[in-house]
């Protein structure tokens, strides 16, 4: 699986076991992602951050 990094033109191949792509947003500014990459389990939302996940190449 390949996931985008924070800069959309950059991407990386995910390591074994991390087979979801994610975008992380601050809850207060939920339109601008602050982090992108590979993740193993989703979602991991909290009071401050929100994750949006998907499982196809570079879908984040």
Swiss-Prot record:
GO terms for cellular component: extracellular region; membrane; other organism cell membrane. It holds the Pfam family Toxin_cobra-type. It comes from the Eukaryota. The lineage of its organism: Eukaryota, Metazoa, Chordata, Craniata, Vertebrata. One of its GO terms (biological process) is killing of cells of another organism. The keyword Membrane applies. The keyword Secreted applies. Expressed by the venom gland. Belongs to the three-finger toxin family. Short-chain subfamily. Type IA cytotoxin sub-subfamily. This is Cytotoxin 9. InterPro entries: Cytotoxin_Cobra, Snake_3FTx, Snake_toxin-like_sf, Snake_toxin_con_site, Toxin_cobra-type. It comes from Naja annulifera.
């Amino acid at each position: 699986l390949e996931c985008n990094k924070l800069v959309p033109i950059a991407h990386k191949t995910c390591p074994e076991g991390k087979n979801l792509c994610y975008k992380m947003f601050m809850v207060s500014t939920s339109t601008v992602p602050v982090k992108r990459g590979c993740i193993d389990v989703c979602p991991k939302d909290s009071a401050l951050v929100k994750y949006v996940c998907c499982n196809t190449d570079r879908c984040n």
